């Protein structure tokens, strides 16, 4: 072959290979992108998973596996006092209809949380170790196995007591944060943490005045590095929800928690906000809200029964829905 032609041919082949590499890398990046990721900034809360995750039912919590491809949440049935943890998988470009999680469906279960490494899923339940219904809620967990989740196990003492324990949230080092109305608190529910040492949880410690008050604090989310804590508080003077619950944030500085701040009208509304959690990639913040079409006085009457029925049975009917917003909206420094 003519040396000149050979040189041109090699140049073309190299260029094609380079372009193919770019296309492959772009495709790989696109495929590895978490399904909840947005191509545009999300400075304002937006409804998440409408019709599948957020529905006309009372939907709360949003616990993702580390790869973001699976979400566990609670479908709540207040009238029957039943809460069921369900799971949805992201397949074929969309969230699939939820199924009952393998460890739920018989007792009242809430507040799923997947550990940062994906090895455990924590939740709270009114089940007892004897397989009967209790009068209080305890923290339970399941462990990841080759065949799925293990059988549920009680986290036991000193975490669980005869009082209620709710909303487990686990940091990267295994430290467990939770809420409880046990004796010795500041009033109502307080938020506690228990350090994992040698595979065992130590005596829980109350997070103190920066976080807890006599009003009641629960539904806590701890960042993996324990730099900040987001939680729900009730009946505080600055509660935008009239006492029904707002989300607050406190940051850990030099081992102490800063006085908590209301996240303001960008996150909170005139109704209830709770169940905070961060996404596995640390870019987004999810929470549950009861905001909807019926949380303020109507400007005009319904035209007919069909319009009333559509409003009462629609996604924004005032029951719980999951919302997503950029984590930067929290103002964490």
Regions found by a protein language model. Name each.
Residues 1-31:
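Bacterial Sec-dependent N-terminal signal peptides
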Residues 29-333:
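Short, conserved micro-motifs composed of acidic
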């Amino acid at each position: 072959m003519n040396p000149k032609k050979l040189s041109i041919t090699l140049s073309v082949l190299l260029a094609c290979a380079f372009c193919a590499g770019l296309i492959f890398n772009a495709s790989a990046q696109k495929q590895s992108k978490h399904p909840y990721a947005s191509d545009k900034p999300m400075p304002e809360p937006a409804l998440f998973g409408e019709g599948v995750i957020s529905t006309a039912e009372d939907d709360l919590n949003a616990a993702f596996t580390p790869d973001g491809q699976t979400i566990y949440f609670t479908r709540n049935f207040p009238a029957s006092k039943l809460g069921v943890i369900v799971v949805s998988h992201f397949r074929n470009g969309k969230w699939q209809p939820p199924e009952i999680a393998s460890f739920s469906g018989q007792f009242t279960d809430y507040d799923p949380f997947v550990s940062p490494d994906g090895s455990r899923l924590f939740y709270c339940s009114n089940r007892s170790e004897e397989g009967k219904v209790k009068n209080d809620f305890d923290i339970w967990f399941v462990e990841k196995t080759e065949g799925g989740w293990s059988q549920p196990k009680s986290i036991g003492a000193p975490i669980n007591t005869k009082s209620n324990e709710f909303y487990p949230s686990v940091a990267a080092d295994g430290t467990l944060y939770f809420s409880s109305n046990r004796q010795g608190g500041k009033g109502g529910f307080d938020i506690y943490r228990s350090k994992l040492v040698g595979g065992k949880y130590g005596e829980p410690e109350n997070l103190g005045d920066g976080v807890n008050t006599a009003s009641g604090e629960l539904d806590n989310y701890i960042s993996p590095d324990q730099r900040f804590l987001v939680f729900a508080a009730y009946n505080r003077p600055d509660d935008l929800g009239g006492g029904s619950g707002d989300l607050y944030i406190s940051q850990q500085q030099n081992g102490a928690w800063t006085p908590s701040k209301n996240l303001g009208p960008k996150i909170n509304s005139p109704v209830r906000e709770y169940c905070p959690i961060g996404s596995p990639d640390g870019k987004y913040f999810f929470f549950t809200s009861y905001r909807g079409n019926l949380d303020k006085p109507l400007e005009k009457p319904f035209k007919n029964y069909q319009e009333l029925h559509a409003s009462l049975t629609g996604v924004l009917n005032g029951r719980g829905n999951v919302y997503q917003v950029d984590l930067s909206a929290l103002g964490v420094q």
